[in-house]
Amino acid sequence: MKNYKALESKILTGKYDDKNIHSLFLPSFGAITIQILQILDHFKLPKNENEWALQHGRVTEKAYQFRDLQTDSIKLKEIISYEKAEQLANEIFNKQKEILSVADEMPISWTSIDGHTTHLTTADKWGNVVALTQTIGPTMGSKVASKGLGFLYAVTLGGYLGKYKPGDRANSHISPTFIEKNGK
């Protein structure tokens, strides 16, 4: 912790319908969030929950193929390109044969009402917006806090495990994102 330094965040921008999407660059996966929304923008709204789940699953699976390419500035522009999203949407659409019932196939952890993530968003009268997402794991995380710091540690790194060396910043699928319409 003594070598940790907070860095200024880079904001990425995309579009969905008539709205602007603003999300964070790495270590957050804001580029992937933008890509998912832009791909979805090329589909009709699903008729029911099963279609919604299948559509979002396919779109997310397609977008996640680009996770490791976010560090390349040329690939990053392609990832958040609306034209690339249209191409990917066409690939997904062309592979769809039929809508299956997926509710019975979902792991129980995907449908559990018990959660351990808190998200807060607030705005003031001048339009300043702050969002905070905190995930520490079930039952208050590790139940360990450093004296004087005022926060609990996560129980597990879960999805953050990977090819990290000392000093690397762990990437996060948590991507604070703001949707803006008409400048608001």
Segments predicted by a language model, with ranges:
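Internal maturation/activation junctions in enzymes
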Residues: 45-135, 149
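Long, well-ordered, tryptophan-enriched scaffold segments
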Residues: 1-22, 26
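Active-site rim segments in enzyme catalytic domains, especially the processed small/beta chain
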Residues: 128-184
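Conserved beta-strand and immediately adjacent loop positions that scaffold enzyme active sites
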Residues: 11, 119, 177
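N-terminal accessory/precursor segments of enzymes
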Residues: 22-44, 167-184
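Short, small/polar residue-rich loop motifs at catalytic or cofactor-binding pockets
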Residues: 7-8, 114-117, 172-174
